[in-house]
């Protein structure tokens, strides 16, 4: 017979004594382990010896922003030049604009040109689950920058800690971090040679306290580059690449309207990859064109479509291209294809003649006609429409909405806006507003139907070419169009001064 040497009372006493100690020991161990996992490598000085130096020559397409930062650089180089005239140099510079426009590159160039120590960090590095850690890291960063002045502190994605305070208990850590940043910026004295730079894609979300004078004194808009800027950026990113004799940077710049510097750098890199894939010695124009199509519309996809669908697709894209040609220089056709890319089964590419910032009502109507021409071609040729025009309808709806709601291009309110969030509008006015929007889209579709019917022969010829070759470039397209007369010249009238008859006054 086996006997247990300890009584039940002894075991119970042991458990009562030691279980709470073991439990709390495990809790403390888990807490210490969790805190040890918190990243300790936080904002630190960038070592120029281990990074590629960036100067003003590497920054293109942002001349206005560059000039603003050059003044900051001049202050860090020769502060007495400003002090003897009583000038107060901005404490902070906020760079804002869409992603990929070169905000970080500008900050790096400014630091390198000034010779100042450069501290770079993302704002998300200051946000932690433990209260007070973000504020402590802000204090440490600014203390180190002051110790190593002259210095530039760059905080990317500033909206992560700089968004407007809500006052909620769950945002306490965020608010403490932001408050500490505000305190540190206020703490810069006249002897400080530290400039803080921030970058954000969402200026409207930042706390107003950050934007007041004395903190981020200068707010610099870093917008997507214009035609000249895109030309300069492409030259910067291709200067170390062997280019073929047929490469025309000017044409590439015209074809990339609306793209950012990051997009253009990606295009230059993709073109080099295309050339290397084909074991070429030089990068050709066709490599850049393929790179642009890949960046803009995605990978080429050879979907298996039926002959019936292929025919519908050919007439749809031919309708877009035909009406675009008839509209003159509003949307000059560069290429038409029924080879799918990304989510699109077919595409028509347009080459803007120049960068435009002002558009007339007639031009916007012409753009709507082009967008609806694919659907119009389907209806006229096949007697029915497909879901292939979904994105076209969305684009047309956005244009018509803007014309009525924002641009005052309707008969019901030609001298004021009628935004969707304007709750002061009566129900009758809202109904009239929606009716005016529908009238614009309906009129554009009726015009597209008329143009397609009138030029059916040219439509058939263009669709036949697409069915035969799948892709038609600009030269082939113009040859198919022949001497077809244009139906609209709205773009040619922009900026033309209308003479008034003195007798009519």
Positions of the model-derived regions?
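Glycine/charge-rich, flexible interdomain linkers and switch-proximal surface loops
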Residues: 85-98, 255, 309-310, 392, ...
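N-terminal accessory segments that target, anchor, or regulate ATP-driven/P-loop NTPase machines
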Residues: 1-44, 204, 239, 249, ...
